[in-house]
């Protein structure tokens, strides 16, 4: 009771900028790995265990054949504190090369902690992520690692030896009588970055994000969401780096379709 077991096997991936299914490769911004190497398949196994209503645990093992393997552990916890709720999200990723290591050496440990406090329509969160080992944190090209840096817009903040801090402020306007409207301010800063292929170390990057979204509450367009996202990104990486100074603005249309 409370245990969910998952396993899967994937041999092709359809990226957002492609019309067909292709073999998987390893994400390699800043020439971290051999991004041209492909894998015949990925297999994973693991599960989630709901210890009680406030605590859940997660453990997974994944292998991207002949590229890398990764073990993931996570702890999610909520605690009523005063008028609000304290949330804790602890995650770890341990990665090494797999099989013939066609993408090159993989040696990374990534540990993160994100703590938030929600009261009324407000939510304040602070987090820290620490990468160690000789390489960046690996993930499949065209996807995102489900860690603390997910949904950043201009960088993945997963470089070798990177130490990342972030602060987030969310507000749900339902608390002010305007249901469906939500906003976010987010600041992410990484330092101690090592870019071996670019002969650079002790580099820094930072990203500031703003979001405003609205989900239509009724009528024929009920559950259609509109979102605007803005980011300002800066770094001191050398020429030739994949991530460069930029400002991004995105507009999204989202739709959630209830099945049951």
Predicted regions and their residues:
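Residue-level signature of outer-membrane beta-barrel architecture
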Residues: 1, 48-51, 77-81, 116-119, ...
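Gram-negative outer-membrane beta-barrel proteins
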Residues: 13-17, 53, 63-69, 81-83, ...
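Outer-membrane beta-barrel translocator/channel fold
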Residues: 2, 6-38, 42, 84-160, ...
């Amino acid at each position: 009771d409370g245990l969910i077991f998952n396993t899967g096997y994937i041999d092709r991936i359809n990226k957002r900028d492609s019309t067909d299914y292709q073999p998987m490769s390893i994400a390699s911004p800043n020439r971290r790995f051999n991004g041209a190497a492909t894998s015949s398949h990925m297999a994973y196994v693991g599960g989630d265990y709901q210890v009680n209503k406030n605590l859940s645990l997660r453990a997974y093992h994944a292998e991207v054949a002949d590229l890398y393997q990764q073990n993931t552990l996570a702890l999610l916890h909520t605690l009523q504190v005063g008028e609000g709720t304290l949330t804790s999200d602890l995650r770890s990723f341990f990665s090494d090369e797999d099989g013939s290591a066609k993408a090159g050496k993989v040696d990374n440990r990534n540990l993160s902690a994100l703590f938030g406090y929600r009261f009324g329509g407000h939510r304040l969160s602070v987090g820290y992520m620490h990468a160690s080992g000789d390489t960046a944190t690996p993930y499949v090209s065209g996807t995102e690692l489900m860690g603390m840096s997910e949904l950043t817009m201009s960088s993945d903040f997963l470089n070798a030896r990177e130490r990342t801090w972030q602060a987030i402020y969310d507000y749900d306007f339902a608390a002010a009588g305007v249901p469906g409207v939500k906003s976010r301010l987010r600041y992410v800063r990484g330092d101690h970055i090592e870019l071996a292929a670019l002969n650079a170390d002790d580099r820094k990057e930072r990203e500031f994000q703003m979001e405003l979204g609205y989900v239509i509450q009724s009528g024929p367009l009920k559950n259609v969401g509109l979102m605007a996202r803005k980011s300002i990104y800066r770094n001191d990486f050398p020429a030739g780096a994949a991530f460069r100074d930029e400002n991004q603005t995105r507009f999204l249309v989202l739709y959630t379709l209830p099945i049951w």
